[in-house]
Amino acid sequence: MVEQTWVIHWEGPFTLEEGKKKKVKRSGYVLYQLSGQHHLYGANVLLYIGQTSKGIKTRLGQHDTWIAEEYDEMEVRLGSIAKFSSWRSFEKTTKPFRNPGRRIVEKIEKLLIFACQTAYNVANKNDVKDAEEIRIFNTGHCGPIFPEISSWYFLDQ
């Protein structure tokens, strides 16, 4: 199999309320990350990565219970995904990108969670087998996330 290279363009940070107002269906935002204060790891820590397939307002609303218990206000970043061919073509591409499809979003989410070992993600931390041969470039307002993530590095292929 040949490595697939993808780019995630992150926008934000937004407050939780600003994030809930974003239009996911038409915008192409397929991922989100939550960052904030963690009692052990400190400030501006990547706490959670997830998909927006149910809509960002619905998805973030599902986190309201534990977010209400956090020390400080959370920040939300929204990501759109596109196939990467070159930096020249990337610069000319309109952002946010169109949704690349559920299957690739799932693979990329799994690799992101595994590589970043986010504090609050439980699912997908060890379920990364089908995310092989993927490289991700994180661009835009990435926040506390690696600029490049490769299954070759993190999965020791």
Describe the function of each predicted region.
Residues 1-47, 51-157:
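Boundary/linker segments flanking structured domains
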